[in-house]
Amino acid sequence: MKNKIFSILQIVITVFFVYFTVSNLDLSKLFEVLNNINILYLIIAASIYFSSQIISSERLRYILSDNKFIISFKQNFTLYLIGLFYNFFIPGGIGGDAYKSYLMNKKFNWKLSKVVKLLLLDRMIGLGVLCCILIGLYEIIFLNFNFIYLILTLCFLSIIGYYMVKLIFKNQNIFWKSFLYSLANHTIQFISLFIILYSLGIEDGYFEIIIVFILSSIFSVFSFGGIGIREYIFLSSASILNFSPELSASIGLLFTISAAISSLPGLKFIISKPDYLK
């Protein structure tokens, strides 16, 4: 029941922000911006984003294996792709993580509550690293930058994250390696974003754009695949970034499209489940 309510809420939020964003754009100017995009760059951005998901899936596999849930790379990545597709293309469904948990329980007879808890831990570590990057960039751009102070702040936040994982999830071993997995994952996603910016002819203001991107990633959980919210946050940041509303919104839109393209392979495994998952 709770999952159904959350799914309905996600649909409402997605529709609202898509409508609000579109209503505040000159669509002819938006299409003009998109029409100048080299499709090759979008394919490259999507491919790079896809590689970040490989690292993200390996972070989850590491967390699972450390808790005695042994799964092969092929099995885990296939389940990860299925989850990505569910999250992006099936509004009102049970959600990608919930479906992954169900499949793991069915295939490996793993305790469902434990798997759900580990999937939550995986998400929380990724979110924590994003917040650390966000705070670091804020310090660099908006405050009087002090390298030593920045390092001390990030170390302090990392230690807090370590003890939170230890306290809440009763796990002392996985935090630091998972932290590095997350850092690599987000770095590759930033590279994907840079390719999109290059395709739009944007050559400066990258730090500010990354901050907006991180904020859109954090809040994207409230809509399906970040659709609507990501574009709205970029639209709202147009004046800060010194971009036209259409150019700013197109950054979020193109990243959403590249993420959607990267999620499509999951459909193959939903239509025809491989033998190693039966």
Spans of model-derived segments:
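Hydrophobic alpha-helical transmembrane segments of multi-pass membrane transport proteins
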Residues: 73-107, 114-117, 220-225
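Predominantly cytoplasmic-facing regulatory/coupling regions of multi-pass membrane proteins
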Residues: 1-81, 130-222, 229-235, 243-278
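Alpha-helical architecture
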Residues: 95, 120, 124, 187, ...
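Helix-loop junctions at the membrane interface of multi-pass solute transporters
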Residues: 65-66, 101-107, 237-240
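Hydrophobic alpha-helical segments and helix pairs
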Residues: 99-139
